[in-house]
Amino acid sequence: MQNLEINHQIPASFIEALQKRILAEPQKTGIMICGHGSRDLGAVAEFSKLAKAIASHLPNVPVDYGYLEFATPIIKTGLKNLQDQGVKRVLAIPGMLFAAGHAKNDIPSVLNTYAAQSGLQIDYGRDLSIDTKMIRAASDRVKQAIMSAGDGISNDETLLMVIGRGASDPDANSNVQKVMRLLWEGLGLGWGEVGYSGVTFPLVQPALEHAVKLGYKRIITFPYFLFTGILVNRIYAYHDKVAAQHPGVEFIKAGYLNDHPLVIETFLNRLLEILDGENSMNCGLCKYREQVLGFEDQIGLPQESHHHHVEGINDAPNHTHDHTHSHAHSHSHDDDHHDHAHHPYPHADHPHGPNTLDKEIP
């Protein structure tokens, strides 16, 4: 049985050019990496490790990080640390896969508030989004799972189940579908399906139960997540539950993205985009700007954060950028959150949505 080695090297010429660009800025410039935060200590440790990996590639540039909620340091602490080092301009990037509520509203709200109070210039980058480097990193995780399982079942007889976070933002949810299609077609697998860990539909269990009915001999469950945490653990628990009910199908778990070198390179590219003025998020399907089907009542909601009261809480049972929204985000959370006053998700009662959660799975 073979193991796939990940030996991608970020081009030294790219790293050198990026650092020179940052150091050549007229104002002392630093980098802020903005994470969501989690009650899971493993997730917090993995984000910290990734942030430090980014910093290691830019040794002469001040780099800090912080979390929106449930973990420390909070974002404001990281920004103050940069200011204390004499930084006058901050390149801030969201440590998130897609632009849903946190990347569009909560983080910009925190950054804008700090900038207004401190006078610090903060330029905000975009999410990791759909990117060829991210797809290659994801494909490595899937190929690792296939190679660890052995060659007893062909790719033609394999179904790939990509599990996304799930959001009340239909644009972010649709991106998971695109990731799945690019992996399915690129790897030449027999079939591809999508599920979500929460908020929207289908959730993991109904998605896997549907996949079994399609008759493939192998099902690979791939959490399209950056880090471990409560949700990834829950995804694997549902995977195990459905697998136990169908012993005639081979169920394989793929690892999440974590600190794959191509993920780190994508983050570094987001910094370059800010310097080049190319850091606009995709507004074409933004539910706060356009009449997105089913979400028409959310257009134009005010931009604000609902997470101030959970900043730094890690034991709870708890700018300026080209994509300037004038709206608040709206999402429903099934975990990792205190209750926030959010706009309700319009399909929360869908038969394959949150009401299918197994209360016995934490």
Please report, for each region that a protein language model flagged, where it lies by residue.
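Active-site-proximal alpha-helix that buttresses catalytic centers in soluble enzyme cores
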Residues: 1-362
